[in-house]
Amino acid sequence: AVQGPAVRHQRSDLRTMDDMTPLLELAGITKRFPGVLANDDVHLEVAPGEIHALLGENGAGKSTLMNILYGLYRPDEGEVRLNGEPSGIESPADAIEAGVGMIHQHFMLVPTLTVAENVALGLAGNGVLLDTSGVAERVGELSSRYGLSVDPEAYVWQLAVGERQRVEIVKALYRDCRLLVLDEPTAVLTPIEVEELFVTLRTMATDGVGLIFITHKLGEVLALADRITVMRDGRVTGETVPSATSKGELANMMVGRPVQLAPDRPMVEVGAVRLAIDGLRVDGDRGTEAVKECGLEVRAGEIVGIAGVSGNGQRELAEAVVGLRSVTAGRVAIDGVDVTGMHPSRVRAAGLAYVPEERMRDGVVAEFSVAENLILVDHDRPPFCRRGLLRLGAIADHCRDLVERFMVKTPTLDTPAGNLSGGNIQKLILARELSSEPGVLLASQPTRGVDIGAAEYIHRRLIEERGRGAAVLVISEDLDEVLALSDRIAVMSEGRILAVMDRDEATIQRIGLLMAGSEAVA
């Protein structure tokens, strides 16, 4: 059976928090941009030694608020206080000097420098040449204290994603950080690395460091946080503690309505193999082999999910299957037809639909209208084209129907696709791809960066395709998503599929070991 987070770590003692001077006070923060009220009278406090989760959908105002704290923006109204005093923060340098650190979702490290050099970068006294004397020893002390295993002499480009995150934390601690903001810190980690990170954060909290934990993973919030603040439309809509709430209540606070977090998965009779991948080998962008002897079958009426940390060959596998990347060996077949190496249009004609990982780069033409994007791959065929002329009435009827059925929020059909929200762009892509009722659907990172409401809708549509008899292959770095959707789960590491298991056999622990490259549990 699927299992949740393994351990709920001991919380730091916050019984005297009300008697403390808050480490951080955001008092009545308001920030306006042209046409947008990004923050509206926001109040937030963080105590010393507290892990404070900040939740909210895209556009809720979280990033603006944290950028104000870090000195990237100035508030139009309100005040930032540290230890009861006005912070005086006007730049990131001021924030660092004041003991505020921020670890962005995309790490801010120089790959060609060593760990010690990255830690020393920007420190007072460093000129053109970095002085790393004494840095390695201090890095070793911090690593030992907080369970952050890093080699000071290793080059950053040699490190795995989880190790790079540890470097970012060490870098903040080296600068005597007393308040650390972490933006989606578990997005690129294996379950084992998530548990290790939680231990580190709890140790930091024990030492009095305040932590602001920004994430969309509600289970992690309940497992880790001492307090939770929820934002929506630039305002704080609620503050609570894990013992007094649930995933459903938090999601409701985020979107303003009840949300179905676990999609219904009706029983479906599984049919014949519709997508067959056999012995596939594919080179990556740098010429090295990214996909190594991959084999996988997806049958009618099932969803197979591929789990794995980013950069382990998932993108190259998807692009090879749909015809966007050359194959060096192996075979791809759709309904028994060999489509290996075919042009994407021929693969599509064989019955495959594709929801790409990079929706803005590969899924839509941002400057084209909603209608133009909806007929992008079929504009030269009936009923949209006759004798070389577009049939505008047929196009409009078709597009209106898709926009309505797939709940795409757009002012008009003529609105440029790039003007839509991420969730609506993803719905637009789904509408186009599913309108042909494909036999095989490959969806890569289907809900990355979309709101809870859009993710709920996308999950429902994928399950409906399964019910229709399509073979659905979902590639996702979100393990919760893979577990919620899949009938079978494949785990990919270093270009190989290490194991394929039924959902009833899947545990977070087993998948986590496989994601980390352990074949012993395969």
Question: In which residue ranges do the predicted regions lie?
Answer:
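Glycine-rich phosphate-binding loops of nucleotide-dependent enzymes
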Residues: T16-A522
